[in-house]
C-alpha cells in the first residue's frame, strides 16, 4: 500500500496544490460550459479581507436543510467560516480551527485530538460531511478525532440544531460541512504552497497543491504533512505523550460538461498521536517520563495510536431541464490501532477496522411559481472487524436508509421551508468468545463470552418547518422547529473492555432506546455599515438522552474492573437551553470591535442534584476582539491587519457530579494577538504572511471539555490532571502560484 501511495504521490506532484482561497465560497455551475468554478475575478478581489460584512455573508449560498439557498433565507441557524478565516487561524487540526465560532466547542485529548461539540452536544450527535458524504471513523470514542486534512478545507458550514431531515441519524446537534475548493474555470491552472510553525510544541506543517481545468478535464492534487513534539505549560512542563505526526494526500479527477459533472475524489489520511496517561511521581509530583526521553522528539512515544483513513467518492450531477439530479457513492476504510507494550512495540492492543459504503441520490426540481421541491434517499452500509489482541466493542454489521422530501416557497420578503424524513437502521452485533474462557469453560455459560450476539432495529420520523422574514432591508427574523433522531451506537450498546486512550473500563447497555428531540430556534440579525448584531436562541428537549456514568459500590467507592474505573451507559430525559449573541461595531473606518457570547444550560430532568447536569457541557464563553485594518497603497502590502483578542471562559459550576464523574472548572481568560498581510509584487500577490501569539500571559488553565483534566492528582500541589497548552507563537506563509 505504501508503494502504491508513493507512486500516486510522485505522479501527482510531477503534474502537482489549492486554488487561492476565496473569502466566500461561491461555487457556480455554468450550464454553458459545464464548469463548476470560482467567480472570475482578479487576484485582489479574489483574496478578500479577513472578515466579511454581515451584508455580504447574508448573500452566501449555503447547503442548509432543504437544499442550496442564501444564508439570509435559511430559517435554520447556520454559521459560515470562509477560506480567509481558516487560513489565518493557527490550529493543530480542523476542529481546533473552527472552535472559536460561537456555539462551537471541542472535547480535547491533548493538543492533537479534538471532537466537535455544537451547543453542548457532541460525539455521535454531530455529523461531519466531507467530499459530499458523511465522514465515518470511530466517532463514538473519546480520543478519536476527525480524519480530515485542514489544508484541504476551503470553507465550512456549521448547521446548529437537528439536521436529521437531510442527514439522518446522528445529526441531532448539527452538521459540520467541510467544502473543498471549487473546480477552476476552463484553461485555468494554479498551484499553492503553505507552511507554518508553532513555538510551544514545535509544530511544523506544510501543504502542496496543484489544480486545473483543461477543456473540462479537472484535477486537484494535494499533499500535506505535520509533526509536533510534546506541548508544555507552566504547571506540567512538557506533557509526555502529546506529540503527533500527520500525513494526508488527496486527488480529485473529473470532467465538467454542459449537462453536469462527474468527479472522483481519493483521500488518504494518516495520524500518529501519542496517548497522554498523566502518571506522576508521588515524591516530586512531576509527570513520569521514560528515561532518556527527549521532550522535543518528534518520534512515537509508547503508548500511541495509529489512524489510517482511506476514502473514495464518486460525485455525479446532471441537469434535467431546469432540475438537477445528484448521485454520490462513497467508500471509506478506517483503521485505528493502539500500541502500548514496550516489550512488543509492533503488537497492538486495540485494532478496529471499519468499512463504510455511503450512497446518496436526490433530485431538486426546477422552481415553479416560487416553489422548490427536492426528494431523495441516502444511507450507508458498515462492517466493523476486531483485529487486535484486546477488545472494546464487538464486530458488527450495520445498514440504514432514509427517504426524505423538502419544500420551500418564497413569498416576497418571506421564505418558508420544511420537510419530512423516515429513517430505518438495522444493527447486527457478533458474539465473541475469548480463547482463555473457551479453554477453561465448556459449559457454554454466558460468562465465557466477551460479547453476546444481538440484533436491533431502530426507526424514526423527523422533519423541520421554518421561516425567514426580512422585516427591514437590514433586519431579519428567523424561526425554526425541527425534530431530531439518533440510534444508539455500537459502543453505547455493547462495549465491554478497557480503553487505553480514556483510562476507563466501558460497559454498554443493549436496552437503550433511540434519542428523539424537538428544538425551537429564534434568530434576529441586523447588518449595517456601522454595526452588525445577531441574537440566536434555542430550546431543545431530548428524550432518552444517552450518557456514560461512573459506577460506584455500596460504599460510594469507584468500581474497578482490571484496576480501571468502570463506566456504564445509561439514559434519561434532557432539556437544553441557550444561545449565542454577537455584535460587531465599526466606529470609524478600518476599526472593528467585535464581541460574541455563547451559553448552554443542559439539565437532566427528574434527577437528583448530583446528576442534574449533562456531562461535557461547555462553560459560558465571551470573546472580545479589536481589529484594525491598515490603509495600504496596494503595491507592496495589502489587507494588513492587527487584532487583539480576549477569550474569557467563565467558571463552570454545572457539571455531572455523580460519583465524581466531573468536577467544577475555574474561570480563565486568555489574551491573544494576530496580525497578517498580503505581500505584493508588480500588482500581484506574492505571498500571505500571518503571525499570532496565543495565551500571551502563559496562563495555566484547564478547559472544562479537556479529558486530561481527570488524570492523576499531583500529590505535591494537590492539582488534578494535566493542563492545556501554555504560551504559543506561530507563523504561517501561503504562496499562491498562477500558471
Q: At which residue positions do the language-model features occur?
A:
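Outer membrane beta-barrel strand-and-loop segments of large Gram-negative receptors
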Residues: 347-362, 507-513, 519, 528, ...
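Structural signature of Gram-negative outer-membrane beta-barrels, strongest in the C-terminal barrel
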Residues: 368-372, 378-380, 388-542
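Outer-membrane beta-barrel translocator/receptor signature
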Residues: 137-139, 152-154, 165-235, 242-249, ...
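Gram-negative outer-membrane beta-barrel transporters
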Residues: 538-541, 559-652
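C-terminal beta-signal and adjacent terminal beta-strands/loops
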Residues: 485, 543-544, 548, 650-655, ...
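Short acidic/polar hinge/loop motifs at secondary-structure boundaries
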Residues: 133-160
Amino acid at each position: 500500500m505504501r508503494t502504491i501511495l508513493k507512486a500516486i504521490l510522485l505522479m501527482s506532484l510531477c503534474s502537482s496544490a489549492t486554488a487561492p482561497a476565496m473569502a466566500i465560497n461561491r461555487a457556480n455551475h455554468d450550464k454553458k460550459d459545464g464548469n463548476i468554478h470560482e467567480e472570475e475575478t482578479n487576484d485582489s478581489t479574489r483574496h478578500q479581507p479577513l472578515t466579511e460584512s454581515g451584508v455580504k455573508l447574508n448573500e452566501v449560498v449555503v447547503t442548509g436543510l432543504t437544499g442550496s439557498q442564501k444564508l439570509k433565507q435559511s430559517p435554520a441557524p447556520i454559521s459560515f467560516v470562509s477560506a480567509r478565516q481558516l487560513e489565518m487561524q493557527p490550529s493543530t487540526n480542523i476542529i481546533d480551527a473552527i472552535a472559536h465560532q460561537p456555539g462551537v466547542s471541542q472535547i480535547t485529548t491533548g493538543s492533537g485530538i479534538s471532537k466537535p461539540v455544537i451547543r453542548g452536544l457532541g460525539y455521535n450527535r454531530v455529523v461531519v460531511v466531507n467530499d459530499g458524504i458523511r465522514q465515518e471513523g470511530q466517532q463514538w470514542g473519546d480520543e478519536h478525532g476527525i480524519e480530515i486534512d485542514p489544508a484541504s478545507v476551503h470553507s465550512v458550514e456549521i448547521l446548529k440544531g437537528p439536521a436529521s431531515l437531510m442527514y439522518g441519524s446522528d445529526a441531532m446537534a448539527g452538521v459540520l460541512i467541510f467544502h473543498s475548493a471549487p473546480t477552476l474555470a476552463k484553461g485555468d491552472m494554479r498551484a499553492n504552497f503553505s507552511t507554518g510553525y508553532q513555538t510551544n510544541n514545535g509544530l511544523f506543517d506544510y501543504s502542496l497543491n496543484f489544480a486545473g481545468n483543461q477543456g473540462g478535464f479537472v484535477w486537484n492534487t494535494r499533499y500535506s504533512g505535520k509533526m509536533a513534539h510534546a506541548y508544555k505549560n507552566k504547571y506540567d512542563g512538557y506533557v509526555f505523550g502529546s506529540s503527533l505526526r500527520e500525513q494526508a494526500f488527496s486527488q480529485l479527477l473529473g470532467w465538467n460538461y454542459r449537462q453536469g459533472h462527474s468527479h472522483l475524489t481519493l483521500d488518504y489520511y494518516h495520524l500518529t498521536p501519542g496517548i497522554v496517561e498523566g502518571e506522576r511521581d508521588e515524591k516530586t509530583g512531576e509527570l513520569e517520563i521514560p528515561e532518556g526521553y527527549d521532550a522535543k522528539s518528534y518520534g512515537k512515544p509508547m503508548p500511541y495510536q495509529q489512524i489510517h483513513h482511506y476514502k473514495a467518492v464518486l460525485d455525479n450531477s446532471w441537469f434535467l431541464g431546469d432540475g438537477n439530479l445528484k448521485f454520490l457513492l462513497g467508500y471509506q476504510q478506517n483503521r485505528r490501532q493502539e500500541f502500548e507494550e514496550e516489550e512488543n512495540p509492533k503488537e497492538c492492543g486495540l485494532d478496529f477496522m471499519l468499512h463504510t459504503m455511503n450512497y446518496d441520490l436526490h433530485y431538486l426540481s426546477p422552481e415553479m411559481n416560487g416553489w422548490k421541491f427536492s426528494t431523495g434517499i441516502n444511507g450507508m452500509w458498515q462492517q466493523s472487524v476486531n483485529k487486535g489482541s484486546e477488545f472494546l466493542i464487538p464486530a458488527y454489521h450495520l445498514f440504514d436508509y432514509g427517504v426524505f422530501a423538502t419544500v420551500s416557497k418564497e413569498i416576497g420578503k418571506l421564505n418558508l421551508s420544511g420537510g419530512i424524513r423516515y429513517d430505518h437502521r438495522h444493527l447486527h452485533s457478533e458474539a465473541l468468545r475469548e480463547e482463555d474462557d473457551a479453554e477453561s469453560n465448556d459449559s457454554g455459560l454466558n460468562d465465557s463470552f466477551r460479547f453476546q450476539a444481538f440484533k436491533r432495529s431502530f426507526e424514526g420520523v423527523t422533519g423541520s418547518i421554518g421561516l425567514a422574514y426580512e422585516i427591514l432591508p437590514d433586519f431579519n427574523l428567523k424561526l425554526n422547529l425541527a425534530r431530531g433522531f439518533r440510534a444508539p451506537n455500537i459502543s453505547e450498546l455493547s462495549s465491554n473492555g478497557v480503553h487505553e486512550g480514556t483510562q476507563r473500563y466501558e460497559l454498554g447497555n443493549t436496552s437503550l432506546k433511540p434519542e428523539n428531540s424537538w428544538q425551537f430556534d429564534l434568530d434576529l440579525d441586523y447588518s449595517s455599515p456601522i454595526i452588525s448584531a445577531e441574537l440566536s436562541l434555542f430550546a431543545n428537549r431530548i428524550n432518552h438522552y444517552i450518557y456514560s456514568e461512573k459506577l460506584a459500590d455500596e460504599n460510594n467507592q469507584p468500581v474497578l474492573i482490571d484496576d480501571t474505573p468502570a463506566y456504564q451507559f445509561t439514559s434519561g430525559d434532557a432539556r437544553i437551553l441557550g444561545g449565542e449573541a454577537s455584535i460587531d461595531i465599526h466606529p470609524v473606518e478600518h476599526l472593528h470591535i467585535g464581541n460574541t457570547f455563547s451559553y448552554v444550560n443542559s439539565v437532566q430532568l427528574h434527577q437528583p442534584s448530583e446528576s442534574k447536569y449533562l456531562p461535557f457541557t461547555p462553560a459560558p464563553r465571551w470573546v472580545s476582539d479589536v481589529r484594525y485594518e491598515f490603509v495600504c497603497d496596494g503595491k507592496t502590502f495589502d489587507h494588513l491587519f492587527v487584532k487583539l483578542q480576549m477569550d474569557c471562559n467563565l467558571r463552570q459550576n454545572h457539571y455531572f457530579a455523580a460519583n465524581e464523574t466531573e468536577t467544577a472548572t475555574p474561570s480563565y481568560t486568555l489574551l491573544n494577538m494576530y496580525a497578517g498581510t498580503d505581500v505584493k509584487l508588480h500588482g500581484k500577490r506574492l505571498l500571505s504572511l500571518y503571525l499570532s501569539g496565543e495565551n500571551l500571559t502563559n496562563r495555566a488553565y484547564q478547559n472544562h471539555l479537556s479529558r486530561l483534566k481527570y488524570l492523576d492528582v499531583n500529590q505535591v500541589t494537590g492539582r488534578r490532571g494535566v493542563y492545556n497548552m501554555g504560551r504559543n507563537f506561530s507563523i504561517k506563509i501561503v504562496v499562491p502560484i498562477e500558471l
